[in-house]
Amino acid sequence: MSRIRETFASLKRAGRGGFIPFITAGDPDIATTERLLIELAAVGADIIEVGVPFSDPVADGETIQRASERALLKGVTVADILACVARAKQHIDVPIMLFSYFNPLLSFGTDRLANDAKEAGVDAILVTDLIPEEADTWTETLIQFDLDPIFLVAPTTSDERLKQIAQQARGFVYAVSRAGVTGARDEMTEDAEVLVKRVRSVSDLPVALGFGISTAEQIQHVWKFAEAAVIGSAIVREIEKLAASPDLINRVGEFARSLLERTQIRRAGRGAKRQRSVNSKL
């Protein structure tokens, strides 16, 4: 069983939903990304999603687009990101998932990427613009290196494609709460719950719901019908607001912690004391 599946199995035994924060690697810089990984693990993240910056992030809203632009202006590369994950993983045990467009990974080399990602401690990779009909070789490569291939499904995903994704995915299925790009929203539609039911009809994999989740109330709502909630733009927006602050790490950590505390589920991260002592030295 992969570490991603072990995490979901542990959540099921504990009777609680998963909390998956997203950050863009290299925003505002790669050293801060390393410290944020440690901090988010300390406050209670179950899995951390790390975005690979790309120059044409068509699936992302303005907040994450700006984060990608800032990271690219700093010259952040795939190699930098993997090295960052490797350093952070010396101090944390939370599974890490890369969220990327295919172009940066192709440029790096898919076999090399899978090998280096595994060595760095990455547990799963989601390629947002790779359709399942063209993903056989990619999926086989990831599985060869014990990495979980993660796929997106949306309310507009056809039943046929949903079945293909169910056959190829490992770890969990990433369900998009609504059609469109990433970004925080005030309200969620019924489409999300309907989509999760459709996934369950063809797969026994856990389902994480993302895109548009930004409040504790929304997280609680998602946990009623999905195994985990992904919080992206809301956290990236906090990083953007605090980019010039020397207290960025603590304040982003407090923001993430506040979301969890307001769900009335308090929990320490894995090795939280150790992670905090490490972060204070970085």
What are these regions (language model features)?
Residues I47-S55, A124-L126, I131, A175-G183, ...:
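Glycine-rich phosphate-binding active-site loops on the catalytic face of alpha/beta enzymes
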Residues G61-M97, E140-I150, A154, E190-V207, ...:
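Alpha-helix-loop-beta-strand connector modules within alpha/beta enzyme cores
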Residues I30-I38, T157-A166, L209, I213-A229:
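Catalytic cores of alpha/beta
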Residues I64, K74, L152, L162-S201, ...:
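Glycine/Thr-rich beta-alpha phosphate-binding loop at enzyme active sites
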Residues F19-I23, I48-V50, I96-S100, I125-V127, ...:
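Hydrophobic faces of well-ordered beta-strands that scaffold small-molecule active sites
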Residues L73-V76, V122-E134, D148-T157, T182-R185:
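Catalytic beta/alpha-barrel core
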Residues M1-I20, V85-K89, R267:
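N-terminal amphipathic alpha-helix/helix-capping segment at the start of soluble metabolic enzymes
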Residues I81, K197-L205, S214-K224, A228-L282:
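Alpha/beta catalytic cores of nucleotide-metabolism and tRNA/nucleoside-modifying enzymes
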